Amino acid sequence: MIAFTSQMPHIVSNAYIKSPTARTHRGFSAGSYKDLTRVAWLNAPMWAELFLENRDNTLYELDTFIESLNAYRDAIASNDEATLITLLEEGKRCKEEVDG
């Protein structure tokens, strides 16, 4: 559970902020950017230890997330609006079910 609720947000945030675009975003970012990147400010040695101590669960969550990202990427790359809408609606529905 910790891999999903705590460790993954830190990994995603940290990976996201490494985009070359991050250095040129000023004036274009708002709440979504701030929400996603807040936890990138972290204690690297502590988090590395936590990721490795929970290695199997963290890898499971990472693999699941990568698979999901690839589905979005494939839909965008193939200009498949219907699939993209389905993916987005599924995500919204999951959020409503989980956090209603």
Model regions: which residues?
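Conserved Rossmann-fold dehydrogenase catalytic segment
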Residues: 1-6, 23-26
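Active-site oxyanion/phosphate-handling segment shared across diverse enzymes
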Residues: 5-9, 40
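Acidic/glycine-rich phosphate/pyrophosphate-binding loops and surrounding catalytic core
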Residues: 13
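Interdomain hinge/lid region at the active-site interface
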Residues: 24-94
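Amphipathic alpha-helical coiled-coil segments
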Residues: 97-100
